A protein has these predicted regions:
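Soluble C-terminal extramembrane regulatory/interaction domains of multi-pass membrane proteins
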Residues: 145-255
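Short amphipathic alpha-helical coupling elements at transmembrane boundaries
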Residues: 22-25, 83, 87, 162
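Pore domain of cation channels
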Residues: 4-73
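Non-catalytic, well-ordered alpha-helical scaffold segments
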Residues: 42, 62, 79-86, 90, ...
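Alpha-helical membrane-embedding segments
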Residues: 45-63, 81-86, 103-120, 238-243
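Membrane-proximal, non-transmembrane interface segments of integral membrane proteins
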Residues: 71-151, 156
Length: 255
């Protein structure tokens, strides 16, 4: 714009205002209008401006198209990712959450903040997330039924391995960390043939591994519930009715 204005002012001998008007008319109408260059250099400059204007327009269109395609691709990946996350919680996550929270001596202090319902807003999910991040997760390892936990996770070992191999998860670091934490607990338990007379140091080690997975399970569950609330109301309804933290949860709709 500045280049064209100065050029026409110098070549055609027009005022700055007339030159600016000339540039706008030339670019907007691709050279067609009541104003046109008289001199040969002016005509050449007009052609240059037209070409630059068309090039800029095409560049803008290309950028907009690229942004739209990238957004659509991202939405598609997010749908696939959350479908995988949903399968994980259905097969493994909900059972672990119910078990770990049952053995958490202080869980009742945070439980009310995790009773998700249909009236929740983004503000409620934010509050729940902040609470989950600041909460000191723990499990009473002496109360945990380690043989039952081992059997449960060993049954799901193949499923967890397939999830870890899923390329869709490469773009979701926090969920990948969750899978690794759960799989690590699986391996720790798998290598132990008995849990009778377990040394205190070993019990504490297992408690730390479970705590790591427990914390990540809750955080990712909150994010997943928010996604369902905003995108899939029918799936969210079932998720609310199977909330592992709600002692009164029932899949049956009473009213």
């Amino acid at each position: 714009m500045v280049f064209g204005t100065i050029g026409f002012s110098f070549i055609e001998g027009k005022t700055i205002i007339d030159s600016a008007y000339f540039v706008v008319v030339t670019m907007a109408t691709v050279g067609y209008g009541d104003v046109h260059p008289v001199t040969t250099p002016g005509k050449i400059l007009a052609v240059v401006i037209i070409v630059m204007g068309v090039g800029t327009f095409l560049g803008v269109i290309a950028n907009i198209t690229e942004i739209m395609l990238a957004k659509r691709e991202m939405e598609s990946r997010m749908k696939k990712l959350n479908m995988v996350i949903g399968v994980f919680y259905s097969e493994v996550g909900l059972g672990l959450l119910a078990s770990f929270s049952r053995y958490d001596p202080d869980f009742d202090s945070i439980r009310p903040d995790l009773i998700v319902n249909a009236n929740w807003t983004d503000k409620d999910f934010l509050k729940a997330n902040k609470g989950s991040l600041s909460y000191n997760y723990s499990v009473d390892i002496l109360r945990v039924d380690l043989p039952a936990l081992k059997n449960f996770l060993m049954e799901k070992r193949g499923f967890l391995l397939r999830l870890l191999e899923n390329p869709v998860l490469l773009e979701h670091q926090s969920f990948t960390d969750l899978l690794r934490a759960v799989f690590h607990v699986t391996e720790e338990l798998a290598y132990r043939n008995t849990f009778i007379d377990t040394p205190e140091a070993d019990s504490n080690h297992l408690a730390t591994d479970i705590k790591r997975a427990y914390h990540l399970l809750v955080s990712e569950w909150i994010a997943y519930m928010k996604y369902l609330k905003n995108n899939y109301p029918f799936l969210f309804s079932l998720a609310v009715r199977t909330n592992p933290f709600n002692k009164n949860a029932s899949v049956v709709i009473e009213n």
